[in-house]
């Protein structure tokens, strides 16, 4: 009978290299990317008005406020409108009480305007917002514009 052939294993003379340095390199690159994102967020927070529209509120009477938005170059009429609507939906709770508001467009301001100076000029939109307990005042302030109810 024939004998089974023996299994021959050869050991490599070179030892496997430790992977710890690769781990440190990957961790360092990851931390560097996180730091870059956080630095960008910090830089834009300081110059927030330059990138976004800031809502400005002026109380009228009761729950009624006059609301408009100002900002830097990216705050054109579209940005002002979005900021006003976002502020209305976040600040007022229609489940507590119904809400009345109107948004009045200023036709003197062009749709795309870049207010880069300290004097931002007139706002493109102005809104009057209030709960229905003050609906008479909202109707008076809105005059001929459409009044929305939520």
Curated annotation (Swiss-Prot):
Stated consequence of mutating residue 41 to Y: Partially impairs LAC1-LIP1 complex formation
Transmembrane segments: 21-40
Topology of the protein relative to the lipid bilayer: Single-pass type II membrane protein
Ranges facing Cytoplasmic side: 1-20
Entry binding sites for hexacosanoate: 40
Domain remark in the UniProt entry: The C-terminal domain probably plays a role in its function.
Summary of subunit composition and partner proteins: Component of the ceramide synthase complex composed of at least LAC1, LAG1 and LIP1. Forms a heterotetrameric complex, where one unit of the LIP1 homodimer interacts with LAC1 and the other with either LAC1 or LAG1.
Protein name according to UniProt: Ceramide synthase subunit LIP1
Organism: Saccharomyces cerevisiae (strain ATCC 204508 / S288c) (Baker's yeast)
Gene name of this polypeptide: LIP1
């Amino acid at each position: 009978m024939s004998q089974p052939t023996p299994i021959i294993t050869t050991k490599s003379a070179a030892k496997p290299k430790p992977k710890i340095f690769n781990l440190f390199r990957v961790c360092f690159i990851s931390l560097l990317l996180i730091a870059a994102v956080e630095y960008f967020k910090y830089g834009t927070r300081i110059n927030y008005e330059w990138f976004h529209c800031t809502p400005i509120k002026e109380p009228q009477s009761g729950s009624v406020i006059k609301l408009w938005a100002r900002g830097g170059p990216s705050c054109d009429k579209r940005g002002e409108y979005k900021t006003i609507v976002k502020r209305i939906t976040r600040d007022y709770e229609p489940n507590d009480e119904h809400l009345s508001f109107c948004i009045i467009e200023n036709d003197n301001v062009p749709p795309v305007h870049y207010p880069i100076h300290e004097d931002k000029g007139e706002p493109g939109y102005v809104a009057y917002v209030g709960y229905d307990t003050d609906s008479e005042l909202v109707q008076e302030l809105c005059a001929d514009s459409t009044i929305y109810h939520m």
